[in-house]
Amino acid sequence: MNIRERYQEIEKSFLHPKSCLSSQTKGRLKPEPEDDIRTPFQRDRDRIIHSKAFRRLKHKTQVFFSPQGDHYRTRLTHVFEVSQISRTIARALRLNEDLTEAIALGHDLGHTPFGHAGEAILRELHPGGFEHYEQSLRVVDILEKNGKGLNLTFEVRDGILKHSKGRGKILSDEPFTLEGQIVRVGDVIAYINHDIDDAIRAGIIKKNDIPQQFLKFFGDRHSKRIDKMVRDVIFTTIKEDYEKISMSPEMEEMVHSFRDFLFEKVYYNERIIEEFKKAKRMLESLYNYYLDNPHIIDAQELEEKELHRKICDFIAGMTDRYALYTFEKIFIPKSWAVP
């Protein structure tokens, strides 16, 4: 019995009966030999961490575009916070922590530069539309490793595809595994808490602007809010016998209301909307430039449908700073150097 097999025996004896055991994975798109040390979900996590798309997240917007301060969240710090919250829930529930971590780290790989501004403009311009969660799956299935993809397990791919979506339902049994459902909830817990912190730091709102009903219910500090939400998820799920990852009705209602407050006061704030519009115009200019000059991205031989797809993939993969650099290089006149 090798190291992986011993660990999988530990999973069988320790994890909850409704957990997803690594030995019972539905497998990969392309079958491959098992590793003698790592389980399939551990390998998926490692492949995600070592991918180029994962490294690019450090220069992609969470809410505030290319912030000058050092303490604002980026898309990379966001996925780490989602991972931490989700792993805490998974461990407390005796669910598969490795699977949970892999989904959490991979769930935003398809996010565009400039956050949801990039997603919105690509949705308008690309004939097939655009959703970042679908793009995340496309990244791991096709785009990474020069078109070979990461060949992740079904369970991780399912969790990536079905994580939380904007103002959609927080709780859902859409993800095939309970671990995927954890990440869906963990994503919301992470962003509604860190985005409110960043909004206060940026002067978009003041702490006193947060309604007293939220401060009284969740607590007045970042750590208190997260702790209360996480505990509610854990104990409600246990109480409901793991039917699905759950929140108490009161908590779910308050989280929805708190998220609505964020949309109204932060995401739809005039200052953010103005920057949102600028980012959309910039990315639209780049998109149309590549349509007119497909040779720049080696796409001159492609039919129109494939050309749109390649441009969409190219722009979605950009970081904020690379998009700014490219726009400046193409559209901003340079001063003439005197010999």
UniProtKB/Swiss-Prot annotation:
PROSITE patterns for this protein: HD
Domain HD, residue spans: 75-192
Keyword Hydrolase among UniProt keywords: yes
Pfam family, one: HD
InterPro entries linked: dGTPase (IPR006261), Diverse_Catalytic_Enzymes (IPR051094), dNTPase_2 (IPR023023), HD/PDEase_dom (IPR003607), HD_domain (IPR006674), PHydrolase_assoc_dom (IPR026875)
Gene Ontology terms describing biological process: dGTP catabolic process
Domain of life of the source: Bacteria
GO molecular function ontology, one term from the record: dGTPase activity
Record key words, sorted: Hydrolase
UniProt record similarity statement: Belongs to the dGTPase family. Type 2 subfamily.
Protein name: Deoxyguanosinetriphosphate triphosphohydrolase-like protein
Organism (species): Thermodesulfovibrio yellowstonii (strain ATCC 51303 / DSM 11347 / YP87)
Taxonomic lineage of the native organism: Bacteria, Pseudomonadati, Nitrospirota, Thermodesulfovibrionia, Thermodesulfovibrionales
